[in-house]
Amino acid sequence: MKRDYDLARKYYRLGVLESDAYCYCQLGVMYALGQGVKKDAHAALDYYMQAAEMGDALCYCNVAWLYESGELGKPDLRTAIKWYKKGAIRKEEHAIEALKRLNVPFEK
């Protein structure tokens, strides 16, 4: 199946105009992965942060991953763990698994 990233981006941007956290997150994914746009971790972070501020727990994980992986420059585990913990508090399974993988204690 052919993916139409231009069309997806168009509709996600319309969602952003309505302050839709999911659309912010998906635009972040597009920039993080370079899907139909030039790969740009800093633009991805901006979109993820907007969604995170709206309470999107998955975007807490996406922010954390950008810091953990070094996509933004030098890897920053301290900041990544802070964001994974925010996601784990909201019961986001990806965040909980990441904390386990990093051997960071966390109680639900």
Regions found by a protein language model. Give the residues of each.
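Hydrophobic face of amphipathic alpha-helices that form TPR/SEL1-like repeat modules
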Residues: 1, 26-33, 62-69, 101-105
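Short helix-capping/linker turns of helical repeat alpha-solenoids
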Residues: 17-20, 33-35, 40, 53-56, ...
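Terminal, low-structured helical/coil segments at or just beyond the last alpha-helical repeat
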Residues: 86-108
